[in-house]
């Protein structure tokens, strides 16, 4: 069984399949990916649900006052994310007529959307090949390749590995599976030094 097939099978059996942003709506995937930067899933869920109540689509977000967006973001921190979200919503509304671009180049040109977020939108919303490079995915790959203690080797190896081991279809399940495996099973290891610092 191929690496990608194992990840997809694991995802279908054990992964998180009921998160509120698990949809093919790129707006919802995008908002969740921005919120999840530096923030745990359990923390994001109530903020995401409240944000969607106030801004259910990209047009509503683009027309909102920035102060209103920041008020709805309060408690998540990293307010630059909210400002970029608002600015990008305006661009998607004006330039793309409220339709999210479904290609890497156009996505990474938008404020606040980097390589990993673009990969997540492509894979999770459009079911297209997209490379998700969040901490969970990096941890899975680093342990699989046995380069966990060699960040330089991981940086050199991760993209070729993911490219070569991505499935031919079902990018959504593969991407979600890699993130879930890293979050639920292949977790961060805490050393006694780290515990002493807390």
Q: What are the functions of these language-model segments?
A:
Residues 3-189:
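Catalytic cores of DNA base-excision repair glycosylases
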Residues 190-198:
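Single conserved hydrophobic/aromatic residue that forms the stacking wall/gate
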């Amino acid at each position: 069984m191929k690496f990608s097939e194992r990840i997809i099978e694991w995802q279908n059996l054990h992964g998180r399949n009921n998160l509120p942003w698990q949809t093919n709506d790129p707006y919802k995937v995008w908002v969740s990916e921005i919120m999840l930067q530096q923030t745990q899933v359990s923390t994001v869920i109530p903020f995401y649900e409240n944000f969607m109540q106030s801004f259910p689509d990209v047009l509503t977000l683009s027309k909102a006052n920035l102060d209103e967006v920041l008020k709805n973001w309060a408690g998540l921190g990293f307010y630059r994310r909210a400002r970029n979200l608002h600015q990008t919503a305006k661009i998607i509304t004006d330039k793309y007529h409220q339709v999210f671009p479904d290609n890497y180049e156009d996505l990474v040109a938008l404020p606040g959307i980097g390589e990993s977020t673009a990969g997540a939108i492509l894979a999770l919303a459009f079911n297209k090949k997209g490379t998700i490079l969040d901490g969970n995915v990096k941890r899975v790959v680093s342990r699989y390749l046995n380069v966990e203690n060699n960040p330089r080797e991981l940086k050199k190896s991760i993209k070729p590995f993911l490219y070569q081991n991505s499935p031919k279809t079902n990018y959504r399940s593969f991407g979600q599976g890699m993130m879930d495996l890293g979050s639920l099973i292949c977790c961060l290891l805490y050393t006694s030094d780290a515990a002493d610092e807390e």
